[in-house]
């Protein structure tokens, strides 16, 4: 399962409020994570995409719902390039977001496909 929940950045969007009270956002996320955990197969994985405005709180919440022993990795995704960002928009632009990856149960293993390295890509 891959989810991209509201980042709770304080912005107003047409279809949802991204400026929730912190405790409201945590409650909303806990409810959804608990539901998703019930829906996951025993060998299932969940990837949750977030930025740093709530990323560290989400990590602790996912530790509680899925268990710290089921945490696999936090991936960091570059979403902007500094040299291509309009500087006048804001003083500081976030360039990296996070994806927290958990498994439902300890024995779950990702299915890895063999890469075809028989040709030169470069």
Predicted region positions:
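Core catalytic lobe of class I
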Residues: 1-122
């Amino acid at each position: 399962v891959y989810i991209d929940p509201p980042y709770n950045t304080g912005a107003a969007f047409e279809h949802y409020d991204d400026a929730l009270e912190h405790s409201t956002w945590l409650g909303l996320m806990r409810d959804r994570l608990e539901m998703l955990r019930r829906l996951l197969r025993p060998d299932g994985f969940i990837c949750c995409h977030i930025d740093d405005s709530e990323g560290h709180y989400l990590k602790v919440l996912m530790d509680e719902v899925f268990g710290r022993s089921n945490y696999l990795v936090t991936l960091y995704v570059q979403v902007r390039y500094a040299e291509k960002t309009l500087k006048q928009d804001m003083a500081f632009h976030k360039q990296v977001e996070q994806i927290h990856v958990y498994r439902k149960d300890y024995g779950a293993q990702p299915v890895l496909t063999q890469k075809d390295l028989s040709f030169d890509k470069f």
